[in-house]
Every structure is written in structure tokens, then in C-alpha cells.
């Protein structure tokens, strides 16, 4: 299934000229049917992943591809794998990678089917809504190299519980939970007001060396 260009917010081809994460949301191609990880959440997620040039990273539940683009901007010379079971999300991720001048292997699949075939990686991020959160996280942990970083973004308390219990059962280290509550300004006739966005939980951990 191809995304109709007319359904997207059309923007001219460009590249992000900075090393810092947090590319403005409006610079991405978007669709109302595919969620985008907001720029402030992306910036924090990238910091939790602890990326550097040459790393290999898996993005499970890539959605619009905004986080995949941010990852590619940090791991120049490395490799990125983006996975989603939604065909429109995969097409949108490819569009955003192209418009920012990055390359990644974008895979239309259920994560449980494709993760066993991917190489071991330095970092993995899991987002979106999956039917079997625990199994996907277990498989993700098995793909992490020693000292590899796992980051999970979720808006659901139930998913956070599943993630944390799985992480603790796997004896990961440096386990951290950060709740992100962002408010953005909006200009109104009488001044500027702040509009709150949905809280996001960012769970991060490190795979031990032994």
C-alpha cells in the first residue's frame, strides 16, 4: 500500500544540519494515521540510547520514522534497522529517511518474526503498541551486545509494567524510568498558553557484560 502524497504534509527536501537531536516535528512527512514521536521525547530517547558513530541499532515500532532518522544522524557509518507491522508506517519511514538523506533497512514485519534474523546490536529501542510486549523485549535483550542499551517508550501503564518485569527478570543494569510531560506554547488572541501533551514513560537499561 502506497501513501498518497496528497494526504501528507508536503515539505521540500532538506537535511538536518546539526548533530543535536530533537529535529522539529514539522520537518517530517506526517500522516494522521501514523503516530510521530514528538521532538522532545526523541531528544531524551536518543540520550538514553547512548549512541555514537558506527553503532548498529534496531528501532522496533518505527511509526513515522522520526526516531529512525534521529538514530541515523547519530550513528553515521553504522547500521539501523527499522521494524513495523503497519504498511503505511513503513512507507512513511522510508520517505522520511530519504528526505533527510539517510539509509536504513526498513522492514514490514511483526517484530517477533524478524528479530531472530537480525544481527546483534549496540542499542535497541522499542515503541508503539505490540501484542506481546514481554516476548518482544526478551528477544530484543537477546540481540543486545554486552553493555548494550535498551530503551522502551510507552504511554500505557500496562506496557510499562510488562517492560519493567521483563527487564528485572533479565538482570539488566542501570534500570531507569523517566516520565516525560511536555507542554507546548500556542499563541492566542490574548497572549500565549501552554498545551499539555500525553505523558510518555521512557524506560532504559544496560545489558551487563556477563
Question: Model segments located where?
Answer:
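Conserved SAM-binding loop of SAM-dependent methyltransferases across substrates and taxa
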Residues: 64-76
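S-adenosyl-L-methionine
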Residues: 83-121
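Short SAM/SAH-binding signature in class I
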Residues: 120-128
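A short, conserved alpha-helix within the catalytic core of class I
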Residues: 131-139
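C-terminal substrate-binding/active-site "lid" region of AdoMet-derived donor-dependent transferases
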Residues: 139-197, 201
